[in-house]
């Protein structure tokens, strides 16, 4: 599986996300594709200093999400499942493994999404601290855990579905 993360001025969140993916899902840098969509927060320089990191730079910024995903798929010749992930969402323990299990629970399933907890602009200092906040119930007071909504911030796409669909509509 390849993980595509599109970031725009989310350098610190991206670093936390990469660490969470490594710690909780065993996803290594070679399985990541980071897309900097015109950030001005030092992300580009950081990516250029990491020789094992797969990345794309969209200099103009503001590229459509589907155009970026199409570009990443073509540039890195992705021929496996893809996890599209927004850096402002936190991966919880076992969530990627569970998504993979559900993705292959039926041959007709082409994509799965988890329930997500979005904690606004509040961020923890590191991933361990963030997980502790959730375990202790110290998340944003306005978040109702009984009414979580699905979002496109995290979606896992099956390779066979991607082959059938082809490129994503870029309008």
Predicted features by range, described:
Residues 1-2, 31:
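Cell-envelope/extracellular polymer assembly enzymes that use nucleotide-activated donors
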Residues 5-6, 34-35, 86, 112-116:
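Short beta-strand segments
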């Amino acid at each position: 599986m390849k993980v595509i993360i599109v970031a725009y001025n989310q350098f610190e969140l991206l670093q936390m996300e990469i660490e969470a993916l490594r710690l909780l899902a065993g996803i290594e840098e070679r399985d990541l594709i980071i897309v900097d969509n015109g950030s001005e927060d030092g992300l580009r320089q950081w990516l250029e200093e990491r020789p094992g990191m797969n990345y794309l730079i969209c200099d103009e910024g503001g590229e459509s999400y589907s155009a970026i995903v199409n570009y990443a798929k073509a540039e890195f010749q992705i021929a496996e499942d893809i996890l599209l992930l927004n850096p402002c969402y936190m991966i919880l323990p076992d969530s990627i493994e569970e998504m993979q299990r559900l993705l292959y629970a039926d041959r007709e399933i082409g994509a799965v999404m988890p329930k997500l907890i979005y904690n606004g602009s509040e961020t923890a200092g590191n991933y361990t601290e963030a997980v502790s906040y959730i375990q202790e119930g110290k998340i944003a007071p306005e978040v109702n855990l009984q009414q979580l909504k699905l979002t496109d911030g995290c979606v896992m796409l099956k390779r066979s579905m991607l082959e059938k669909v082809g490129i994503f509509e870029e309008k």
